[in-house]
Each structure stands twice: as structure tokens, then as C-alpha cells.
Amino acid sequence: MSIKISETLTFECETGNYHTFCPISCVAWLYQKIEDSFFLVVGTKTCGYFLQNALGVMIFAEPRYAMAELEEGDISAQLNDYEELKRLCVQIKKDRNPSVIIWIGTCTTEIIKMDLEGMAPKLENEIEIPIVVARANGLDYAFTQGEDTVLAAMAHRCPEQKTEIEKKIDDKSIQELFSFLPLKTKEKSNKSFTLKNTFSLVLFGSLPSTVASQLSLELKRQSIHVSGWLPAQRYTDLPILGDKVYVCGVNPFLSRTATTLMRRRKCKLIGAPFPIGPDGTRAWIEKICSVFNIETQGLEEREQQVWESLKNYLNLVRGKSVFFMGDNLLEISLARFLIRCGMIVYEIGIPYMDKRYQAAELTLLQETCKKMCIPMPRIVEKPDNYNQIQRMRELQPDLAITGMAHANPLEARGINTKWSVEFTFAQIHGFTNAKDVLELVTRPLRRNNNLENLGWTNLIKIQKR
């Protein structure tokens, strides 16, 4: 039986009545990733309460982030902003001595037009610690865009790649230094110099060190060396950028960073699908290999092995339907992976859609739908939650992947839910972590199966009558 499917993806845009976390929540994972950093959030009491409650870190634990709390005197311009921030930064230097201080701007600093970018260079010279300014405020579309803002700001601080003239001068000085060595040794050193003039690869996106190592290892198996990550584990190890550097993203919400790397740092962007799921990871590696003119080795077999290991999960999700309400900008990649697993995706709600940055991912989504003979899902940018609930009532999906604000009301209406924020903090990238994605997706489905086996669902139905 052949299923008639639409050839192209349909995009819609609604009013954007969505609820999400504030982008300053990026501090939660970035302060752990950049080990020698200190994050200073410049905002009001509300920002402080959010960080304190959402991150669950007590003050006495002395985490590597703090609040510079704005008071009435700051807002009415009675206090000197520069002196106040200087006092705090001097104290941070004395207590923690970080390699970099990252100022996180908030809605309030935007509204009162606080010139953080103007103050930072002057204060940086005084305290002799780099200060990076990132305006990760609540005016963004999704909370994950906070990381995008920080990485875009850090891209400006990456060391510059040396020009050909500078390289030749360095090479000449090294050759002169080793001029006493035999001729054969000099020839070998010349060969190594010419090899170093080729293009290098830098990956951008914050991932746990184990996942980053896994992706680097997968590329190493294809004879591709990753010269650096943005962000690096230490600020002092930021990657070298320049016109002979290829960059590739690992997350769909880093469009601002990609633009900065291309326009400001003259890097060349590799437009690849994102390494989420075995299919996405394979496509990501293949695209990078094609840019470096390298034929992939054993990648198809590697992907097949992963699919074989996921059989138990695939039997659970095959034929089930899912509805994405939109929360963290990972929706397109997750939907593509779940379609490949045999699920039907009714709708992909997404807070913001950069079609250029996600072009390769959208193409892979289209190809996956055709391969699986599944209708193309409708993609709704800035979805109206009220309209979404009406559509869900009609469609009755088996699972809704939603923000925390809507989870309980939907559960009360008999729709299984999964918090989208869990996918942000879980390890979902690469071949080996595909299992974790399906573990999260199938948890509510497995719970329902267990309740049915115990007879609880029948009891609930009787009570409702």
C-alpha cells in the first residue's frame, strides 16, 4: 500500500504565545564546561531567585557564578555602575582568580541601557583579567540561545591564525635555529611545515567532555583531526580561528555563533545535519569528510550496529505519534531522529527557525520522511499554545514533548508528556548516546504499559464514570 506524501515541508508562523526558561539559565551548564571561568549575572532580584531555584546550587557551595544585583540606586543612576562592578570584579579576582570573567546582561540592563561593552575593556585593563560581555537576556526566543550569545562573544577572543608571511618568518627562524642539524633533518622539518599549512577543523557547541571526546574520536577514525572546540574546557585553550579554519556546529541553536565565526573571524562554515541519533551522526561525519575530500570508512556498518542495539526501544515507539510543542530549538533534529525510528510526527513547534543554519537538517528531515513513507510534519514557528492544545485535542498524539509549564495540564487531559528541557541536559549527541534519547522518549510509554499490566488504567476509567 503506497502512502501519498507531500514533497515539501510546510512552514507556518503564529503569534508566539509560548512559555520558556530565561536564557540566563545557560550559566547552569557553561560554568561547569569552562572550568577556569566565573559568570557574573548583572540583573534584578528576579534573576537571582531564578538562578538560585532553577539551578539548585546553594550559596555556601560557592559556585563559579554570582549575581550583581541591581537596586533602585543603580536604576535611577544615583550610583556609579563602573565603580560597583569594579568592586565586585576585584573581589572575584581575590577570592577565585579565574582566567576569564563573563558578564551576563539581563532584561534590566537592556532597558536601562547599561553600557557593559563600554565598561568591560577599561575594567579589564585595570584588573588584568579578560572580561567577556554576553547579553543573554529574556528577549531571546528560547533559553538555549543564551549559550549562543556567550559563544558568539567568546569567538571574538579566540587567537588569530597567523598569516602566510608570519608563518614564513617563524619557519625561517626555526630553520636558522636548527641550522647545525644534518640536511636530512632539515628536509623532514620542511615537510612538516608544509603539512601544517592545510585547513584545520574547529567544532563549536557546549557538550560534556565525554561526548566531545566521542565525537572527536569518531572523526579521528576517518583521519580528521579536531584542532579545537568552542568553548574549550579552559579559557586559555580557546581554538585558533582564521580564513584557513573550517567550523562546524553540534547544536541547532548556535546560528549567532556561526554568523560571528563566518563574518567576523572569516572561518568557513560546514553546513551539516547535527550529530543527534545514528542517522544524524553519520550524515554529520560524512559532510565533514566530503569537505576534506576524505572517503568515509566503515561508517554505514557503524550506524547499522547502533540501530541493532536499539531494537527493543524501536519496537516500543514504532507506529506511535508525537507532537512537539516547541521549547529549546532541538525540535527539528529530534523529530527527524524519531521519524527514522518509525514514529509519526504530527507537528514540530519551534520558537525560532534559522532556515539557513538548519538547511542541511531540514533536507535530512525531508529525506527521512520519504524513506520512511511518512507524511511531512508541519513546522510551526512561534506556535500559539492555545491553538496547539486545540490541535492536540483533535489529533490525540501518543506523546507530547513540551515545556514544563504545559506538562501537568496536558497530563490531566490524558496526553502523555515529556519535558523538552530533559533533552537539553541529557547526553544525546553521537552514536553511543542515541539510546539515551529513546530512553527519555519511551519512559512515559513504558510507564503506561506497566500501569495497564497492573490494572490501574481500568480502575481510573471506572472511577471517572
Swiss-Prot record:
Annotated protein name in UniProt: Light-independent protochlorophyllide reductase subunit N
NCBIfam families from the UniProt entry: DPOR_bchN (TIGR01279), PRK02842.1 (NF002768)
Function: Component of the dark-operative protochlorophyllide reductase (DPOR) that uses Mg-ATP and reduced ferredoxin to reduce ring D of protochlorophyllide (Pchlide) to form chlorophyllide a (Chlide). This reaction is light-independent. The NB-protein (ChlN-ChlB) is the catalytic component of the complex.
Pfam family, one: Oxidored_nitro
Reaction catalysed by this enzyme: chlorophyllide a + oxidized 2[4Fe-4S]-[ferredoxin] + 2 ADP + 2 phosphate = protochlorophyllide a + reduced 2[4Fe-4S]-[ferredoxin] + 2 ATP + 2 H2O
Subcellular location(s) of the protein: Plastid, Chloroplast
Cofactor(s) this protein cannot do without: [4Fe-4S] cluster
Cofactor: record remark: Binds 1 [4Fe-4S] cluster per heterodimer. The cluster is bound at the heterodimer interface by residues from both subunits.
A single GO BP: photosynthesis, dark reaction
Binding locations of [4Fe-4S] cluster: C22, C47, C107
Keyword field contains NADP: no
Species name: Marchantia polymorpha
Keywords (A to Z) from UniProt: 4Fe-4S, ATP-binding, Chlorophyll biosynthesis, Chloroplast, Iron, Iron-sulfur, Metal-binding, Nucleotide-binding, Oxidoreductase, Photosynthesis, Plastid
One GO cellular component, as annotated: chloroplast
InterPro entries, sorted: LIPOR_BchN/ChlN, Nase/OxRdtase_comp1, Protochl_reductN
Subunit text: Protochlorophyllide reductase is composed of three subunits; ChlL, ChlN and ChlB. Forms a heterotetramer of two ChlB and two ChlN subunits.
Chief location: plastid
Protein family: Belongs to the BchN/ChlN family.
The EC number(s) this enzyme carries: 1.3.7.7
